[in-house]
Amino acid sequence: MGKKSILTTPVSRRGAITLGLGTVATLALAGCGGGGGSVDSASTGSASTGGSGSYKVAMIMSGTVTDGGWDQGHYESLKRAVESHPNWEMLEPKENTADADAASAAQSYVDMGVNLIVGNGNQFASTWAEVVADAADSNPDVNFLITNTDPERELTDYTSLDHVMTVLPDFMQTGALAGVVAGLMTKTKSIGFIGGMKLPSTTKKYAAFLAAAQKVTPGVTGQYNFEAGFTDASLGTKLTEQWINSNNVDVMWGDASAVDNGARQALEAAGADTHFDIAQPIDIVGDDQPTVITSTVTDWMIGQAMDDIEGGSFGGGKAITGNMDNKGISLGKFSDKVPADVQSKIAEYADQVKSGSFLTDDEVSAIESTL
């Protein structure tokens, strides 16, 4: 189904956050992407942007808003939500929040009476239980949204879920969209994927990616690495160079933030007119990204959470699913390297992905079970 690279470094994201960013062994974050740090070096959350209405929203993140991946994607989702909700005011996010500081960071916003506190990854699920329980009694107008979190698996130790919800993107749709593009654009029938850490979301994305590519172009093979971390661009370069030289890979998709930048460097060195990258989770197609032909874009559904708070239906530990129907998942712009007829085919397949008729769960599971 796919071949795992020999260049792997298993690492605990949570443990690596405390070690810094010096080596591959320190590359990790529980939610996805970005480096560790402390609240002391982060934004205090005192400044604000957006509207001046009766609601306030703030985000706590593991990395920085300019990381080009996970954290920036969350920040852009937050900005879009505030722009479409003029009665909400956005406080500046707390960046580079380490696990040890996550609870105190959340508590500071609770003390300010912030109506919606967003944690950008499941690392916050394991550190906020006590803060959430206390806030339910002392500040019932405060609500918590934790992204990339399965409430049935990751909120089991919460004593109160009255003011908590999570967001789960449709990973199968995301992977399928990327796979359709890769399958139609590869000339060598060899594609690659780099993930920061082996999580259920990572393996689901890759399995759908490969299954979709094989459906549109039979015979496609996949190379993968799920343990690359999120900060070492040079590792992304090494992995991609290895796959280009040994496996003739000509299309890459990544889920590893800064590591993806390194993969793009290797693709460009091999020839930007013949070697392509599909970016995620933000749309970065442009002249400064010569290998990027499109992007799989994730919106973290913060606007829906705001609507639920205003409507009085927020809470209960429910998960908001981001998918193609509610624009939680989409494809970004196309580079002019994607021919018009290929773009038309992609649109046709994307409609099938959206309707659920393109891939079956069994087709994806058949690949995922081998990983």
Where in this protein do the model-derived segments appear?
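N-terminal secretory signal peptides
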Residues: 1-11, 15, 19-30
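Short, aromatic- and cysteine-enriched interfacial helices/patches
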Residues: 6-7, 34, 371
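A residue-level marker of the well-folded mature domains of exported/periplasmic proteins
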Residues: 42-371
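Bacterial lipoprotein signal-peptidase II cleavage site
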Residues: 32-44
